[in-house]
Amino acid sequence: MLYSLARPMLFSLAPERAHELTLSMLDKAHKLGIMRQTVEAKPTTCMGIEFPNPVGLAAGLDKNGAHIDALAGLGFGFIEIGTITPHPQSGNPKPRLFRIPEAKAIINRMGFNNDGVDKLIENVKASKFRGILGINIGKNADTPVEKAVDDYLICLEKVYNYASYITVNISSPNTKNLRSLQSGDALTELLQALKARQLELAEQYNHYVPLVLKVAPDLTAEDVEFISAQLLDFKIDGLIVTNTTLSREGVENLPYGNESGGLSGAPVFEKSTECLRLFAQTLKGQISLIGVGGILSGEQAAAKQQAGATLVQIYSGLIYTGPTLVKQCVEAMT
């Protein structure tokens, strides 16, 4: 109700300013104790972790982990922060975020703008949140793709003790050549290095933190087969399906519809759900799947579950539907 009143004002602002203002308002409401949404418990086990409910916040909303406590008050079963990189970076030039309300869509070309992994860890330490926290890691824009493994290893080592699970983001379309890591020897070398280090860290800290890969929806059936085989070979714990799409289907004739970047929101739902279904058919339950992409209703969350997801994540849907979407999704899922 409150969000439906605030939305016209927020939508009158530039998208990035509205994003900042929303998080600021959420923080203030949390401190005053007036922003707390009660969501039914629906315990769900995934990757050896018991989640209080299967609906999480996707990475990208809270890149630096600066708003964890306020976001936790919305009733999420888990929160994923990031994408974080070894060093701070400003991302791509503005404007870089575009709303397409006619299609309930967003295009972003943010470019992993973040304050660096050390700042994120400071924020996590300062948080009172003791729930399930995913940390999404990436590479700096000025790191050559041939050296990308080094950036992921730095982040893995630094966040290991602060994360419930760690997501390896190789699917953002907004960092040059990043998606090339989804194929061939590049993927093999990355997963091999990360898995070896994960096992060393698990032994060192006597605590196993699951490793999750996040992929794009713009994959062929052959890509799905190859990625699935690699995930199984290296015993990766989970897969997030999917990131944003490069397709412009459904928005090509709308204002901002042909801006460069990744498209999210309603138009990506079918594409990402089909990709999820393909991975589910290929992996046959051997790896946990997390469905994300275009969820704007409880029914769509349930559809992701039917396509093979154990958990779901939302982000763009929150912008168009508001925080009640969390509750709707939890209620619709089994």
Swiss-Prot record:
Catalytic residues as annotated in Swiss-Prot or TrEMBL: 172 (nucleophile)
Membrane topology summary: Peripheral membrane protein
Keyword Nucleotide-binding part of the UniProt annotation: no
Gene3D superfamilies: Aldolase class I (3.20.20.70)
Subcellular location: Cell membrane
Catalyzed reactions: (S)-dihydroorotate + a quinone = orotate + a quinol
Positions of substrate binding: 63, 108-112, 169, 174, 243-244
Cofactor: record remark: Binds 1 FMN per subunit.
Top EC category: oxidoreductase
UniProt EC number: 1.3.5.2
Cross-referenced CDD domains: DHOD_2_like
GO biological process: 'de novo' pyrimidine nucleobase biosynthetic process; 'de novo' UMP biosynthetic process
A single cellular component GO annotation: cytoplasm
Residues that hold FMN according to the record: 59-63, 83, 136, 169, 214, 242, 265, 294, 315-316
Biochemical pathway: Pyrimidine metabolism; UMP biosynthesis via de novo pathway; orotate from (S)-dihydroorotate (quinone route): step 1/1
UniProtKB keywords: Cell membrane, Flavoprotein, FMN, Membrane, Oxidoreductase, Pyrimidine biosynthesis
Family of this protein: Belongs to the dihydroorotate dehydrogenase family. Type 2 subfamily.
HAMAP family found in the cross-reference section: DHO_dh_type2
Biological role stated in the UniProt entry: Catalyzes the conversion of dihydroorotate to orotate with quinone as electron acceptor.
Subunit details: Monomer.
NCBIfam families, A to Z: PRK05286.1-1, PRK05286.1-2, PRK05286.1-4, PRK05286.2-5, pyrD_sub2
Protein name: Dihydroorotate dehydrogenase (quinone)
Species whose genome carries this gene: Acinetobacter baumannii (strain SDF)
